[in-house]
Amino acid sequence: MERINVNLGDRSYPISIGAELFNTPALFASAISAGRRVVVVSNETVAPLYAAQVMATIRALECEVSLLELPDGEQYKTLETFNQIMTFLLQGNYGRDVVMVALGGGVIGDVVGFAAASYQRGVDFVQVPTTLLSQVDSSVGGKTAVNHPLGKNMIGAFYQPKAVVIDNQCLKTLPAREFASGMAEVIKYGIIADYEFFVWLEQNIEKLQALDNEALCYAIGRCCQIKADVVASDEKESGVRALLNLGHTFGHAIEAEMGYGNWLHGEAVAAGTVFAAKTAHEQGLLSEEDVIRITRLHERAQLPISKPTSMDYDSFIKHMMRDKKVLSGQLRLVLPTSIGTAEVVSDVPHDVLRRVINA
């Protein structure tokens, strides 16, 4: 088992990574003390697979545990689902000492985290991510949110969990398309922060796709370490943390335009990352060779590298101008400057974006 710490002073928390961790009460004990009431929130896909196991482990800590099962899908990452959680907590007369456990992928983690941040002005929660995307990215760092029809993650809060427990054996039940979606975020870390990791991915992507345990532990651990370091230095995304949004400005536009859930988040980010690489090349920031390597690795990961055929420049810009990184009406993009480094650029000419998007 690997253990990584997110260093945020008195709000620091551990990330535990390994196999068969759901049977280890000690990993939950740092966040859940004896006698506390616990609500495990999951979805209709994950709950039948893992809820009983996780609940039994938490009960071993002498806690009362209940389950709230929600519908599955990005289309349910809404204020309506948030309100459903609130109603469950209020009807159950849960106090401020309740602990919420987010058992599922990124949607569950985001909406449960936002509910934990909001219920009685903040209660403890634990992230138990079950998809590759949530294990390497969304479960770490405290970003919580729900979507709005006009934009993704527009309603939310920064709110850190008390612990993250990552059991990579969950990936055995993950559909291939969902695994590929998670690979988009894995590749992202290599592009923005670690050239050697990118090279390792080029050499080992087939091992990851075959669910090789050693390769998975290394990749998940490396991603979590990079994110933990970034979050520790810039929790509220005022500086370097913005680099974690590589591909996301383009990607969120695809998700919003196509309808949440029709393109998976990682699929949209993959296409967005390729657009960002091509934009960087047009701006003289990135070599053609690096654009080719970035594009090929996404292709090998079974990810899209082009936009939906129904979208054009105008449909992209409509959504991109609502991005949270827009300042004073100016679009700001994360662009790679080489494999292993990136920067936020705010002066990309619209004719360049039009050329890249409509190519």
Swiss-Prot record:
The keyword Chloroplast does not apply. It comes from the Bacteria. Its EC number is 4.2.3.4. Keywords: Amino-acid biosynthesis, Aromatic amino acid biosynthesis, Cobalt, Cytoplasm, Lyase, Metal-binding, NAD, Nucleotide-binding, Zinc. Zn(2+) binds at residues 185, 248, 265. Binds 1 divalent metal cation per subunit. Can use either Co(2+) or Zn(2+). Pathway: Metabolic intermediate biosynthesis; chorismate biosynthesis; chorismate from D-erythrose 4-phosphate and phosphoenolpyruvate: step 2/7. Its cofactor is Co(2+); Zn(2+); NAD(+). It is found in: Cytoplasm. GO terms for molecular function: 3-dehydroquinate synthase activity; metal ion binding; nucleotide binding. PANTHER family: 3-DEHYDROQUINATE SYNTHASE (PTHR43622), 3-DEHYDROQUINATE SYNTHASE, CHLOROPLASTIC (PTHR43622:SF7). Catalyzes the conversion of 3-deoxy-D-arabino-heptulosonate 7-phosphate (DAHP) to dehydroquinate (DHQ). Belongs to the sugar phosphate cyclases superfamily. Dehydroquinate synthase family. This is 3-dehydroquinate synthase. It comes from Photobacterium profundum (strain SS9). The gene is aroB.
